[in-house]
């Protein structure tokens, strides 16, 4: 999914218009919506400073906006192949279902990814058990790794996200 699609997704999630978001970022009122439309459609790509400003206004991590190319199934497959090469991601089958798992023996990066995925699973389990709301879960995901308690420099999460 391209950065423009992520901007669009989070803008709608926050109930903002293109004009409002553009003006909040400092674009002139006359062209704010056009400028945002250019970023959302991919005809323009925001530089790092604008990506950081967008993330701040949209209340997400800049990492939530910048994701690999998963716009097509082929792009997604190559992303998974790269994860296999670099992080020990393995595909298997269990009870007729496709499963992805991390081979922690591959290298220290694979072990770290395994820890991060385990933390994600813990948050998902809290959501499934009703211990946290969908909003709290989404806040954890969209601000990752800010509220990840397994990270050394993690900030204190909102109530319920521990």
What are these regions (language model features)?
Residues 47-51:
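Long, hydrophobic alpha-helical segments
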């Amino acid at each position: 999914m391209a950065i423009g699609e992520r901007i669009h997704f989070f803008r709608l999630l926050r109930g903002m218009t293109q004009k409002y978001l553009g003006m909040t970022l400092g674009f002139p009122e006359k062209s704010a919506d056009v400028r945002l439309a250019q970023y959302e459609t991919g005809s323009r790509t925001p530089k790092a400073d604008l990506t950081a400003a967008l993330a701040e206004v949209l209340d997400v991590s800049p990492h939530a906006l910048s994701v690999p190319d998963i716009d097509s199934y082929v792009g997604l497959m190559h992303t998974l192949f790269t994860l296999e090469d670099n992080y020990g991601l393995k595909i298997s089958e269990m009870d007729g279902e496709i499963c992805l798992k991390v081979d922690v023996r591959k290298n220290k990066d694979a072990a770290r990814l395994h820890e991060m995925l385990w933390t994600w699973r813990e948050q998902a389990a809290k959501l499934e058990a009703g211990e946290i709301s969908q909003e709290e879960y989404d806040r954890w995901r969209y601000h990752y790794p800010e509220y990840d308690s397994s990270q050394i420099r993690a900030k204190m999460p909102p109530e319920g996200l521990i």
